[in-house]
Design a protein with these regions (language model features):
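Rossmann-like AdoMet/SAM-dependent catalytic core
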Residues: 159-179, 184-281
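Alpha-helix boundary/capping residues
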Residues: 43-44, 112, 170-173
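Flexible glycine/acidic-rich beta-alpha junction loops that bind and position SAM and/or redox cofactors
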Residues: 4-5, 60-65, 97-104, 116-205
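Conserved small/polar residues in nucleotide/adenosyl-binding loops
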Residues: 282-286
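Hydrophobic transmembrane alpha-helix bundles
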Residues: 25-36, 58-70, 91-97, 124-136, ...
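Conserved SAM/AdoMet-binding glycine-rich loop
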Residues: 1-97
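A short alpha/beta connector and helix-capping loop motif
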Residues: 105-112
Length: 286
């Protein structure tokens, strides 16, 4: 790791910042040193973003793919950079690695999700010609597509059915987490489950069971589908989630009227009417 080279590059882009251009860097977070992090702290918000390839937190998997990552150190660095509030972080996981089954991938997911990155990217192993993974494919029971990008179908640890389930979770994470349109709702909904992975797994199953994956959805429809899911599984908290969803909707959308899924709000109307009546009384001539 050439720290001097990295510092030279980052100093240059900071000194020549045009206020518009964004630079994307793929880094090993556990190798960042104090000087580099202190420099990041001084950068314009949005000047740089970091992509951090965690891939897995399963120790057996990490050893098998010859990585030296120390996840505890990665987590410490990610939290610290998060606290700066000026650098977006994208953390990556890869499904289909050796010794990674559905359950252990779920743990890797929860470990990374807890770090609250701006983006959590779920990828699937690509078995490139001449790579180490191709050499060990028989040992791993690794079956993958015969055409580029040679993506994994299943392994001796991860059956094809579970690969499909992870595909569904990938879609839910893209829609309900990475879009940043449902931040407050998903934080509240997570409290209803023993893990974030379980939450996205259940939501993915709901999409699959109702045929939603085969349909193109408007953004507003995503709110309605999520509320329908909540109505089915958390009926007693429907009113709470409707309000939080409405709040998220107004935060992200340039809405001129109350969304259909929010329904009528008689309480709001009473408060508005009372407010205007008070204003009229206050401004009326004596």
């Amino acid at each position: 790791c050439k720290h001097d080279h990295a510092m030279t590059v980052w100093h240059y882009i900071k000194e020549h910042d045009n206020g518009i251009t964004n630079f994307h860097f793929e880094v090993a977070a556990d190798l960042l040193n104090e000087e580099e992090m202190e420099l990041m702290k001084t950068m314009r918000p949005g000047l740089i973003q970091l992509e951090i390839g965690v891939q897995s937190t399963n120790l057996d998997t990490i050893r098998e793919i010859h990585r030296t990552m120390k996840f505890e150190q990665v987590a410490e660095v990610v939290r610290r950079i998060n606290s700066y509030g000026n650098v977006h972080q994208h953390l990556d996981l890869i499904a289909g690695l050796p010794y990674e089954d559905y359950e252990s991938f779920g743990k890797s997911f929860d470990d990374v999700y807890a770090l609250e990155p701006e983006q959590l990217q779920l990828g699937f192993l690509k078995v490139l010609k001449g790579s180490y993974m191709e050499e060990r494919k028989d040992d791993y029971g690794l079956v993958y597509k015969g055409m580029p990008p040679y993506e994994v179908l299943y392994t001796k640890w991860l059956p094809y059915e579970d690969t499909l389930r992870l595909k569904g979770i990938e879609e839910m994470v893209e829609v309900y987490y990475n879009s940043r349109q449902f931040t407050n709702t998903m934080e509240e909904l997570e409290k209803e489950y023993d893990s974030a992975f379980t939450m996205y797994d259940r939501l993915a199953s709901y999409y699959e069971d109702n045929g939603y994956n085969a349909v193109q959805h408007k953004r507003s429809a995503r709110y309605e589908i999520l509320l329908n899911y909540i109505r089915l599984h958390h009926k007693e908290k429907e009113d709470l989630f409707r309000e939080v969803l409405t709040y998220d909707y107004y935060l992200r959308e340039n809405a001129k009227s109350r969304p259909e899924f929010a329904g009528e709000d008689a309480t709001d109307k009473r408060f508005v009417r009372a407010f205007y009546e008070d204003c009229l009384l206050y401004t009326s001539p004596s």
